[in-house]
Amino acid sequence: MSRRHRAVKREILPDPKFGDVVITRFMNALMYDGKKSTAEGIVYGALEVMRRRGGTTADPVAMFHSALDNVKPAVEVRSRRVGGATYQVPVEVRAERRQALAIRWLIDASRKRGENTMQERLSNELMDAVNNRGSAVKKREDTHRMAEANKAFSHYRW
């Protein structure tokens, strides 16, 4: 057993434009090599594109949260060794990890898209996620399908 203490969670400040902590988390995940202003520009630009596309009443922050909620997984499978055999055991995902996975999947799906700028790719992936389609939503569906297929091993949960 490890004798180390658990690392203290750092407080994340809300983003300057919308005052939202989740958007800051998203920017931090998107950021490469500490280039926060570049990540900020991409996220704010993508949200602006979403606002323009959604009409005058569209709230980009609400759309962002809706997209994130549509990508969050409820269950996932974790490997568990029992008597020489490895079972994929479905377990419920903690709220914190749920958010982290959704953010990671949205960014990965955006990076794999074919549009020219990251801003376009991100806004299109977010719009797809709002409408329950796109690669990130497919990833969540696949995860849920795996958990459903391995439901028989759920008694191995720890």
Swiss-Prot record:
<dbReference type="InterPro" id="IPR036823">
    <property type="entry name" value="Ribosomal_uS7_dom_sf"/>
</dbReference>
<protein>
    <recommendedName>
        <fullName>Small ribosomal subunit protein uS7</fullName>
    </recommendedName>
</protein>
<keyword id="KW-0694">RNA-binding</keyword>
<keyword id="KW-0689">Ribosomal protein</keyword>
<dbReference type="InterPro" id="IPR005717">
    <property type="entry name" value="Ribosomal_uS7_bac/org-type"/>
</dbReference>
<comment type="subunit">
    <text>Part of the 30S ribosomal subunit. Contacts proteins S9 and S11.</text>
</comment>
<keyword id="KW-0820">tRNA-binding</keyword>
<comment type="similarity">
    <text>Belongs to the universal ribosomal protein uS7 family.</text>
</comment>
<keyword id="KW-0687">Ribonucleoprotein</keyword>
<dbReference type="GO" id="GO:0003735">
    <property type="term" value="F:structural constituent of ribosome"/>
</dbReference>
<dbReference type="GO" id="GO:0019843">
    <property type="term" value="F:rRNA binding"/>
</dbReference>
<dbReference type="GO" id="GO:0006412">
    <property type="term" value="P:translation"/>
</dbReference>
<dbReference type="InterPro" id="IPR000235">
    <property type="entry name" value="Ribosomal_uS7"/>
</dbReference>
<dbReference type="GO" id="GO:0000049">
    <property type="term" value="F:tRNA binding"/>
</dbReference>
<dbReference type="InterPro" id="IPR020606">
    <property type="entry name" value="Ribosomal_uS7_CS"/>
</dbReference>
<dbReference type="Pfam" id="PF00177">
    <property type="entry name" value="Ribosomal_S7"/>
</dbReference>
<dbReference type="GO" id="GO:0015935">
    <property type="term" value="C:small ribosomal subunit"/>
</dbReference>
<keyword id="KW-0699">rRNA-binding</keyword>
<dbReference type="InterPro" id="IPR023798">
    <property type="entry name" value="Ribosomal_uS7_dom"/>
</dbReference>
<comment type="function">
    <text>One of the primary rRNA binding proteins, it binds directly to 16S rRNA where it nucleates assembly of the head domain of the 30S subunit. Is located at the subunit interface close to the decoding center, probably blocks exit of the E-site tRNA.</text>
</comment>
